[in-house]
Amino acid sequence: MFSSESRPTVKLPDKWAKKRCFFQLLSSLSTTLKKLCSSSSHCSGFHLIIRPFQRFFGLEKMYRSTKGASKARRDQINAEIRSLKELLPISDADKARLSYLHIMSLACIYTRKSVFFSQAAAGHGMSGSLLSLPELSDLLHTLPGFLLVLTSEGKLLYLSDNVAEHLGHSMVDLVAQSDSVYDIIDPVDHFIMRGNLVPITTPDTDRLFRCRFSTSKFVRRQGSGNKQAIVRARCLPPPYHASPYWTSNPVWVCFCSPLEASMPQLSTSRNPLPTPPAEQSFLLSCFQSQHSRDMRIHTVQDSVSVYLGYDIETLRSRSWYSLIHPRDLSHASAQHCTLLHNGGERQVEMVVQVEAADHSWIWLYIVLQLETGEYPINSHNYVISESEAWSVRQQLHSEQNQLALLYQESRQSSDPLSSPDQVFTPSSSGLSSQSFDFSFITSGRSSSEELPGTSAPSSMTFDPLEGEEIDPQSHGGGHQMWRSAMTIAPEHLSNINLSTVPQSQVAPPPLPPFKAPPKRQRSEEFICTPPYTPRLSGGSFIFNDETLRPSDHSKSAKMRQSITSATNIGPAQPCRKRLYETLPPTPDSPGSDECILMALPEIRGPLYVDVPHLPFHAPPEGLLTPEASPTKKPCLSFFPREDETERERMEISLLAQYISTLAEGFCHNHPQGASAPPHHANSSLAHIDVLMFEEKAVDDIPLPNLPSPSPVPPSPYSSVPSYSQCRSSPVQEEAAVTLIGVNHLCSVQLTHCNRMTEGGLQDGERPDEDMEMMSSQRSSEAPALTPALPCAQSLLEELVTMEPVFGAAVPMTPADRQQDELYQLPHQGGPQMFYQDGTGDHMF
């Protein structure tokens, strides 16, 4: 092509340099040919010319296109996926609907199952099968649920074919685009599932919990349809010589029984129901029964004879409550009332113990469903163990709290826990105060947990048959209950745990000044409110610095009306609230003259109100106990002023000086050695008479007008050494304490002087000078009752004035006014206040 003269002379050091040089020549040549062939239809001739040169110099791979190779690779992958689809053990109809991603997910599921069970069978030396595949399929379809096998991380190994009968869709539909169990479970229950699939050290351990499965065809659209099921999970032992994957991810087999309404299937001779013993069966042992509205048994499955030992005719027309454990009667009655309530739940759940024919106690997880007909209540009774009962009951309680927090209204259930400390602690055997205590305000506690000395019924009962409330206070039952509660011995009050006492038994007596409503509302309106922050009408709010203005009589009366109206919710409300949601108005409330309805979070421990330990003239107004009972008198000032504090400090210091002076007098008059003379009965009686006479004389003398102390001549009998000067007989001490009282400081000094005088009298044996000595002693010692201190007299007057208040506050115990979860101020009397109607107090 090129002549020898025009051929360029290029020095090429090596082979690759020649190739690069020739490539440059080809590039320039290709540019020229493109320009020449741009208008020609034979453009493909360029490739025919250039490719031999590329092949000769090894440069053809630089111009190879990868588009065809990628397509060929994808075709090979798709062919393998189609081959894999044909190996899946599913129907042809399901195979036709599978996508490539779905096929790979199902292939992973069946591969895990085959690897795990083949290794397990090889490790245990098992060969063959007890049942054929058709028999196994028929057995699965007769089960009241479906089987689920998965790893601890949620990867599915197996899902039984009868899942379509319970969830409405086949495994192919439910496992769309994933092989994880969390794609077919409601997101709310993901935490519950993860918590129950935690690896454990002990295999063959059963766990029972409730879970909601998705019934939507498109699994990613959660919430379109869910079905609740009770799940029993058991951890399987790992295969022999298993790989690290199976060691770190234990396999769980779960039996899921949907909690759906269905008529009880009565067993017949042609269709017997399998009833294996509950302790030997992994499947949930269940029997169904039908009841009337009063829970009398109408029909029951024959399997009840296996689980409880009763005959069907024995249980017919028998009350369901006669089988319930006494501890669980209140909880069962509460759920029964909730089911029968108009507009309430159509299904309730409970965990109770029932008595078997051999007088043993069996744990049952019961699902009551309300239907129509003569016998509308359908009961599903699942036989469970004690540990499973603890788990399910705890889950039920936590779900109720979550509903109250998320939806701002609680479930319409009347079973508050008696104490946060007693939440679902399983008992080993017998009656226990820590074993599932559910106190119900309408029915009280069971007979096994009554307080000693309190046998009165609760203040409000509910009759499920009549559907109305019964108020026993109209017959005097409330006052009788209050009197019986007040007659408890003081030594028993210190041993009583107030958290186990029904709130209706520790509530204060009815308030006489208020006019009773014409008809009480539902019993739930009398459930106690949680510990409440005190509202002070003249001080400062305890949890912030907001100053409250003192309210006049009209505002305080309006507040009291709003507080009383908080316990009477009209029937015009759109929904029923829990009683603890009804709170009196707080300083931060939007309005001060009406009740605010709100939901409070669950308090898992005692709530303490931090109150300064300072003297008060009266208890604060609005300091509500858990029964929402107001205190006696309004408080003018919660925190005392500085001048009052200084005055109190001065009085305390003066009192301390006076006590020290009195103690020095005792020390100076103490004898060094003497023998106690014999005491006579007549001397004790004479001493009591003298003390009564002296007490009357002291009370007649006005303390503010006492003369100043004057020197007193020493008594001739005081110098005689006698042991009775410092110690008197027990009869004399008891009489002195009984007649004079322990709260008068002057009586202490008076008693000391009387002992000195009596000791001298007995030692000298001068009965003829008895009256003369007593009169002189009284005239000489009466002015010395008040020390030479400026403010001691006012303090003594205040102590004498407040003595009845101290005596009235002594029997005040936490059992009759408040619970131990709320520490209140001591009840002290203050200045008497009178209202326009002439009464001393509107609160009591």
Curated annotation (Swiss-Prot):
Residues 75-114 are annotated as: Helix-loop-helix motif. It is found in: Nucleus. It holds the Pfam family PAS_11. Residues 410-422 have a biased composition (Polar residues). Residues 704-716 have a biased composition (Pro residues). Residues 61-114 form the bHLH domain. GO terms for molecular function: DNA-binding transcription factor activity, RNA polymerase II-specific; protein dimerization activity; RNA polymerase II cis-regulatory region sequence-specific DNA binding. InterPro entries: bHLH_dom, bHLH_NPAS4, PAS, PAS-like_dom_sf, UPF0758_CS. Gene3D superfamilies: PAS domain. Residues 132-190, 294-343 form the PAS domain. Residues 61-74 are annotated as: Basic motif. Keywords: Activator, Differentiation, DNA-binding, Neurogenesis, Nucleus, Repeat, Transcription, Transcription regulation. Residues 410-432, 444-479, 702-725, 757-784 are annotated as: Disordered. One of its GO terms (cellular component) is postsynapse. One of its GO terms (biological process) is positive regulation of transcription by RNA polymerase II. Efficient DNA binding requires dimerization with another bHLH protein. PANTHER family: HYPOXIA-INDUCIBLE FACTOR 1 ALPHA (PTHR23043), NEURONAL PAS DOMAIN-CONTAINING PROTEIN 4 (PTHR23043:SF24). Transcription factor expressed in neurons of the brain that regulates the excitatory-inhibitory balance within neural circuits and is required for contextual memory in the hippocampus. Plays a key role in the structural and functional plasticity of neurons. This is Neuronal PAS domain-containing protein 4B. It comes from Danio rerio.
